[in-house]
Curated annotation (Swiss-Prot):
It comes from Yarrowia lipolytica (strain CLIB 122 / E 150). GO terms for molecular function: ATP binding; proteasome binding; single-stranded DNA binding; single-stranded DNA helicase activity; ubiquitin conjugating enzyme activity. The active site is at C88 (glycyl thioester intermediate). The keyword Electron transport does not apply. Disulfide bonds: none annotated. SMART domains: UBCc. This is Ubiquitin-conjugating enzyme E2 2. InterPro entries: Ub_conjugating_enzyme, UBQ-conjugat_E2_core, UBQ-conjugating_AS, UBQ-conjugating_enzyme/RWD. GO terms for cellular component: chromosome, telomeric region; cytoplasm; HULC complex; MUB1-RAD6-UBR2 ubiquitin ligase complex; nucleus; Rad6-Rad18 complex; RAD6-UBR2 ubiquitin ligase complex; UBR1-RAD6 ubiquitin ligase complex. Its main location: cytoplasm. Pathway: Protein modification; protein ubiquitination.
């Protein structure tokens, strides 16, 4: 059964294959186009550099009118990531637009890694370290990067 969401996701997948954004990759799981596995490579010249962070994107039949649920599977220490791996990112909530596609979501998440929003943190400890003790924050992030190589 073909739905608008499934057709759109296949277009998103085709775009990811033909014009992949730097440092991100994603594809639907073999038997369900509504569930995607993704990987974000930590941006160069940031504490996240060389990290390989796995994520899951869960879409429903209302996509693209409703954003997917996006969750880190890899361990992540970041002001805008809950301990569950779920993200606090405006474009996945109140600033969602149907014009966003999978590539836009992943590049936004990648950008968020080095530019957190500390005004409404999901991880208060990470936010406080980021603002007040940057060296400690960066050490915790580097520990997360190393963990990303084995998880």
């Amino acid at each position: 059964m073909s739905t608008t969401a499934r057709r759109r996701l296949m277009r998103d997948f085709k775009r990811m294959q033909q014009d992949p954004p730097q440092g991100v990759s994603a594809s639907p799981v073999a038997d369900n186009v509504l569930t995607w596995n993704a990987v974000i490579i930590g941006p160069a010249e940031t504490p996240f550099e060389d990290g390989t962070f796995r994520m899951v994107l869960q879409f429903d039949e209302q996509y693209p009118n409703k954003p997917p649920a996006v969750k880190f599977v890899s361990q992540m220490f970041h002001p805008n990531v809950y301990s569950s791996g779920e993200l606090c990112l405006d474009i996945l909530q109140n600033r969602w637009s149907p014009t966003y596609d999978v590539a836009a979501i992943l590049t936004s998440v990648q950008s968020l890694l080095n530019d957190p929003n500390t005004s409404s943190p999901a991880n208060v400890e990470a936010s406080m370290l980021y603002k007040d003790h940057r060296q400690q924050y960066e050490k915790r992030v580097r520990d997360t990067v190393e963990a990303s190589w084995t998880d």
